[in-house]
Amino acid sequence: MNTQIKFTTPEEAVKVIKSGDHVHLSSVASAPQCLINAMCKRGEAGELKDVHVHHLHTEGPAPYADPKFEGVFQLDSFFVGSNVRKVTQSGYADYIPIFLSETQKLYRCGAVPCNVAMIQVCPPDKHGFVSLGTSVDATLAAVECADYVIAVVNKYVPRAFGQAMIHSSKIDFFVQDDTPLIEAKFSEPNEVETAIGKHCAALIEDGATLQMGIGAIPNAVLSQLSNRV
């Protein structure tokens, strides 16, 4: 990787993507929307074909999964979120079934190539370190294995430490975009969801350790545990 930081535009950065490449997108709130949009513009212009897109759950639009991009982008996701559920169920997009803890192994063992990793990071500190913030999961392995790493520098990305910290020398192109991170917003549980939450909460003992998923039912369960210890 280059040690020289390169600041550029999204349109210039995504020019490193070639037909047939495998592209990783960072997850959830860290989905790099400005890079995604720039990549899709290249697809619309007929500059790309057979590009494989990999990611876990992402928030926000997933324009590369639109059937109009058949033959241009192939979605091979590690998680089926609401923004790609319909196209996956229709058979247009593919899902790779795997445990979350093992997704990084796909890149490290070479089972899934990674030519370009498109990520979001916080601004670099005085030592040149940035943080992956809300998306470490498979993104760290993608950064380590990719031929090119394109990072959106966003002041709203939290500076998480530990394995989330990477040095800017690992990044080939920096793009500035301070768009607030996308939030997952849920409505209040309805009558059925509340009833399910009550039944589940009754089975949970005080002092229990919980692993919660995403969505209305986990939120309904948690809402019934406010007076528990």
Question: How should these model regions be labeled?
Answer:
Residues 1-229:
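Conserved alpha/beta enzyme-core scaffold
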